[in-house]
Regions:
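Flexible, acidic/Gly-rich N-terminal and inter-domain linker regions that tether
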Residues: 1-65, 370, 378, 386-409, ...
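Conserved, mostly hydrophobic/aromatic
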Residues: 57, 70, 109, 166, ...
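Canonical Radical SAM [4Fe-4S] cluster-binding loop centered on the CxxxCxxC motif
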Residues: 60-89
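Short, flexible active-site-proximal loops enriched in glycine and acidic residues
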Residues: 67-69, 85, 98-108
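Conserved AdoMet/S-adenosylmethionine-binding subsite of the radical SAM
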Residues: 92, 97, 115-298
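C-terminal extensions
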Residues: 305-335, 361-422
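Residue-level signature of tetratricopeptide-repeat
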Residues: 353-354
């Protein structure tokens, strides 16, 4: 099979993996090395780093052949699809060739399970070792560790990659047993623990020894599928909170299930991917990470799923109207962060700006506040927004109208690397 044919198959097979960001790790020029993690050039797969930069990665599988038969996966053993596999050298040469042509600045590498997890990981390590040691590639690499592989292989992979991730796949043990019986929760969580400990140890050693080996400097992430099982948003959010706390994950990625295979245990093929639900989970994830919320505050047994009509912070605020309106001139930073339309940056700007004088609603807009949302929950020097009229009965409809204006119209689709452009 020609190399271009392999690339077409294996890049298309990788499109369902959502955990693809560079995380903002900054490793600049090194003498004798090729590439860096900070440039921004056009390329194969656009992703965004933690500081908002658009970066480009070659996003491929080492192989889409797999000994597992996960019912939701397009690459499962029983699915009749074209199979391909790169050799470690082919993958390394392809990556360095794309980099030298200015197509990419890094690599995102995952794989189906060939023969066994250990065998697959050995091939991935060999490919990355050729890149790092033979071609002196210094660019960004995000590698997916294979659950069930020997921990020593995970350690070796972490010494070659900037970020590691282990996909948790499904939110519950029951879902995993039903749809992916070849996988186990223990096999997924064990390498997560090793990566957590490895990154902590690496940081401690680097503080003492400047040239100590660096282990996964950008940390670890994971991905879970939303909509393949009947797990509630509440269950997913509590799982996310636990993963952040126990394993110090940098990111949890949510992937709306795209029906690609027919199975009685899965949604039918004509079911649309729950993209808006995925979006709400990402918004709630940010509330956990940057706004001081806890999962138990956002959802409870009476309301186990998000109202997709409103963003999670608006939903929380409407359920706690007794805490509003908030006085801009007196509220502390933590209180401001709970106001819809106010983010971490704008909240800090408010705290700083109000020292210089009284703030008005027109000032809030200049500070980055989304006044269309925030005006229902704020007072400026004891006054509501000019001309604002609403009641608890109508505020939901007014916020829904704001939300409809912020969401993209039409159906969103995954783009292929080989789609025609023009």
């Amino acid at each position: 099979m020609e190399l271009l044919d392999k690339l077409a198959i294996l890049s298309d097979a990788a499109k369902y993996d959502a955990a693809c960001t560079s995380s903002g790790v900054r490793r600049g020029f090194r003498p004798g090395m090729i590439g860096n993690t900070t440039s921004s050039i056009a390329g194969c797969c656009h992703s965004f780093s933690a500081d908002g930069r658009c970066i480009t990665l070659l996003k491929v599988l080492l192989s889409n052949a797999c000994v597992y038969d996960c019912k939701y996966c397009v690459n499962r053993r029983s699915n009749d699809t074209r199979r391909a596999a790169f050799t470690p050298r082919e993958l390394a040469e392809l990556t360095i060739g794309f980099y030298r042509r200015n197509y990419i600045e890094g690599l995102f590498l995952s794989s189906g399970v060939l023969r066994s997890p250990d065998y697959t990981m050995e091939l991935m390590i060999r490919a990355l070792r050729i890149l790092r040691e033979e071609y002196r590639f210094n660019g960004y690499i995000h590698a997916k560790a294979i659950p069930g592989a020997a921990l020593e292989l995970v350690r070796q992979l972490g010494l070659l990659a900037d970020r590691l991730s282990v996909n948790i796949e499904l939110p519950s043990q029951q879902g995993l047993q039903t749809l992916a019986p070849d996988k186990s929760r223990e096999a997924i969580l064990r390498p997560m623990g090793l990566i957590r400990d490895g990154t902590a140890q690496s940081k401690a050693e680097l503080a003492k020894y400047r040239h100590a080996p660096v282990f996964a400097p950008a940390g670890q992430s994971t991905q879970l599928i939303v909509g393949a099982t009947d797990d509630s948003d509440r269950h997913i959010l509590h799982l996310t909170e636990s993963l952040y706390r126990k394993f110090r994950l940098k990111r949890v990625f949510y992937s709306a299930y795209v029906p690609v295979v027919e199975n009685s245990l899965l949604p039918s093929l004509d079911t649309k991917p729950p993209l808006l639900r995925e979006h709400r989970l990402y918004q709630a994830d940010w509330l956990l990470r940057f706004y001081g919320f806890q999962a138990s505050e956002l959802l409870d047994e009476a309301h186990p799923d998000f109202d997709t009509r409103l963003d999670p912070k608006c939903s929380w605020a409407l359920a706690h109207l007794e805490q509003f309106p908030v006085e801009v001139m007196r509220a502390d930073l933590e209180t401001l962060l709970r106001v819809p339309g106010v983010g971490p940056v704008s909240a800090r700007r408010i705290v700083s700006a109000r020292r210089c004088g009284t703030l008005r609603f027109e000032d809030l807009k200049k500070l980055g506040v989304v006044v269309k949302r925030a005006q229902y929950f704020l007072l400026c020097d004891g006054r509501a927004a000019p001309g604002l009229r609403f009641s608890p009965a109508t505020i939901v409809q007014q916020l829904e109208a704001v939300e409809r204006g912020l969401l993209p119209s039409g159906e969103m689709q995954q783009l292929s690397l080989f789609d025609a452009v023009g």
